[in-house]
UniProtKB/Swiss-Prot annotation:
Record protein name field: Bacilliredoxin SRU_0242
Gene Ontology BP, a term: cell redox homeostasis
Biased composition regions of type Polar residues, renumbered to the chain: 154-172
Region listing for Disordered, in residue ranges: 141-172
NCBIfam families: YphP_YqiW (TIGR04191)
Gene3D superfamilies xrefs: Glutaredoxin
Family from the record: Belongs to the bacilliredoxin family.
Length: 172
């Protein structure tokens, strides 16, 4: 059962006020991805969880402010826009385990960079934003991305994945 609309509305607005378009149905997903077929598109799977509020949404705001920006930015809300969320995962993210919050950068219709929940939990918005900015700099350009362009955040340099105990398990 979807979350109550009144509960998620403020969480939606944190992204829509940035100019990010909401996708509430599979038709919305098809239209957005069709419009971005030969361009870049940032997909954010929003969530009610604390790591979305304290990490993912602020990181997106910081990254878009820093730039560069994708040609399109869209969001679905897990637990609210159930059909759209399931459809975007099944259609555009095959083989990538579902998680929320979640971000994916697409270039020419293909996912080229993903930030999963496990890359968000226990990390500061600035660190998540830096990962996203690195991806935007690599892929949101007219030039071909460098051969060593990242596809996921590199957490190897941060001990215990952002200070989490080694026994911590993400609930992706």
């Amino acid at each position: 059962m979807p979350y109550p609309k009144s509960m998620v509305e403020p969480m939606r607005k944190e992204l829509t006020r940035l100019g990010i378009d909401e996708l509430k149905s599979p038709d919305d997903v098809d239209a957005a991805f069709g419009a971005a077929e030969d361009e870049t598109l940032l997909l954010i799977i929003n969530s009610v969880c604390g790591c979305a509020a304290g990490g993912a949404r602020p990181a997106v705001a910081q990254a878009l402010e820093t730039g560069p920006t994708p040609d399109h930015a869209v969001t679905v809300f897990a637990g609210q826009d159930v059909a759209a969320t399931d459809y975007v995962r099944d259609t555009h993210l095959p083989g990538i385990p579902p998680s929320s919050p979640f971000m994916a950068l697409f270039r020419n219709g293909q996912p080229v960079y993903v930030i999963e929940r496990k890359h968000i939990e226990g990390r500061e918005p600035a660190a998540i934003s830096a990962d996203l900015v690195e991806a935007l700099q690599a892929y949101c350009t007219d030039e071909a991305p460098p051969s060593d362009a990242p596809s996921r955040p590199d957490l190897s340099s941060s001990p215990n994945a952002g200070g989490l105990p080694s026994t911590f398990q993400s609930i992706s």
